[in-house]
From Swiss-Prot:
Lineage per the UniProt record: Bacteria, Pseudomonadati, Pseudomonadota, Gammaproteobacteria, Alteromonadales
Subunit structure: Heterodimer of an alpha and a beta chain.
The keyword Protein biosynthesis belongs to this UniProt entry's keyword annotation: no
Gene Ontology, cellular component aspect: chromosome; cytosol
The keyword DNA-binding appears for this protein: yes
Keywords: DNA recombination, DNA-binding, Transcription, Transcription regulation, Translation regulation
Membrane-spanning segments: none
Gene3D superfamilies registered for this protein in UniProt: IHF-like DNA-binding proteins
Protein name per the record: Integration host factor subunit beta
Pfam families: Bac_DNA_binding (PF00216)
Known function: This protein is one of the two subunits of integration host factor, a specific DNA-binding protein that functions in genetic recombination as well as in transcriptional and translational control.
Length: 95
């Protein structure tokens, strides 16, 4: 599902909101989440999951075109850990 598909679906379900209002709300929510992670803080949405930063240590990688070794710096990357309710709903698909 793309962001525009999500906006369309939410606007249909919430008839009191226009698509523009839903779009503004989603954009603001995503911006707030990005700002929170950028500040190094964790985001927890109970029943859904949590977003945090994980550190990737420096390592030696390879240039896919030339095959030469390249030293990659350590960096923080966003990480999502699904909550119990979300895991259970997804697991139900497999049974």
């Amino acid at each position: 599902m793309t962001k525009s598909e999500l906006i369309e679906k939410l606007a249909t379900r919430q008839s009191q909101l226009s698509a523009k209002e839903v779009e503004a709300a989603i954009k603001e929510m995503l911006e707030q989440m990005a700002d929170t992670l950028e500040a190094g803080d964790r985001i927890e949405i109970r029943g859904f999951g949590s977003f945090s930063l994980h550190y990737r240590a420096p390592r030696t990688g390879r240039n896919p075109k030339t095959g030469t070794s390249v030293e990659l710096e350590g960096k923080y990357v966003p990480h999502f850990k699904p909550g119990k309710e979300l895991r259970e709903r997804v697991d139900a698909i497999n049974t």
